[in-house]
Amino acid sequence: MSKNKYNGKMRPSAGRNPKGKVSQKSLAIISVCAIILGIFITAQEYLDRHTLAASAAEATVTETLAEVVKAIPAYAQTMTAGSSEADALTDAADTLATGSFREKIDAYREVTDILEKHSSDKAAPAKALREAMSTAEDAAVAYNKEAQALNEKIVKFPYNIVAKLGGYAEFPIFSLN
């Protein structure tokens, strides 16, 4: 019989010393991988949380713009029928209801310009429209804070890698006034 180098014991597996203990090198590699994985999981959770918050703030802006759309017809009725401003308000309401994001901002600014021309108007429809617009502006400010926080993180390591892999995108920053 030939003598085995290990005297009948199992051969140690790769990365282990003959006593079966995990080598320091393997332990270091496992630790580094765990730390890197933890960093990326934390980054993804952060992006998920702030994307959700920015999306909720964006939905609030949309809801407040819907309130502006509801207030516009009553204010337009206080103007002379067929006037260019009344028609512009009606068009702006349609755009705010169905337009693209950029078109909605432009329409909002048009309504703001018309309201500024009639700043002395203290009638209830004008007051209701101003209140709805003020609420929309406050919602836009809250949205911009969330979007800015997310956009600042999304370009930094490790968030940029997680953003590319996860399909996260920057949120647009805008101003209603």
What residues fall within each predicted segment?
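A helix-centric hydrophobic-segment signal that preferentially recognizes long
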Residues: 2-177
